[in-house]
Amino acid sequence: MSELLTFGLEQLNTQLTRIDGCLRELTEEQVWSRLTPQGNSIGNLCVHLAGSEYQHIVSGIGGKPFIRERSQEFSMSGGLTPQELRERLHAVRNQSCEALSRLTEQDLDKRVSLLFKLEDWQEMKGSAARDTEPCVTRSIRGHLMYTIEHYANHTGQIVLLTKWLGGVQ
């Protein structure tokens, strides 16, 4: 495995360890509580991270079927325990490791397109969505970098929310 892939997985695993620690400290009620009606709960962020990682790495890079309901990731208000959220995140990570383990250094420059459902694309892009295809095309390297940055961003939010809710993280 290339140095970038190894480093990328190390970074993703570091973030997952942080999320694990947060989820171990919180009740199901805390995991699904929102600071504001428009805000996301820790549960929403975990489901969103699992969906995004699956779409970018497992499906986009790894070629598995596209299975994602992005809008539901933010509308959920419960239904998964902290343990079930951890299991979901780890299941996706295991699939990501499998997909990335098959790549060579040369594969990192291959371009991969990710399709989005039109309603998700419009929600993400706003008025700019009218003029573009609901698709993101970038190199595998780019998808990996995006996933690492995205995961770290939301991990920071999860850690902050955990502290706000009284967890130690």
Task: Place the predicted regions along the sequence by residue.
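Basic/polar N-terminal segments that are highly enriched at the extreme N-terminus
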Residues: M1-T6
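Alpha-helical packing segments of well-folded alpha/beta enzyme cores
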Residues: G8, Q15-I19, T81, L85-A99, ...
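Short, contiguous alpha-helical
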Residues: L9-N13, Q30-S75, F116-Q169
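Long, hydrophobic N-terminal alpha-helical segment
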Residues: L23-Q30
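Residues within well-ordered alpha-helical secondary structure of globular protein domains
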Residues: E25, H48-G51, A91
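Proline-centered turn/helix-capping motifs that create local helix->coil transitions or kinks
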Residues: L100-K110
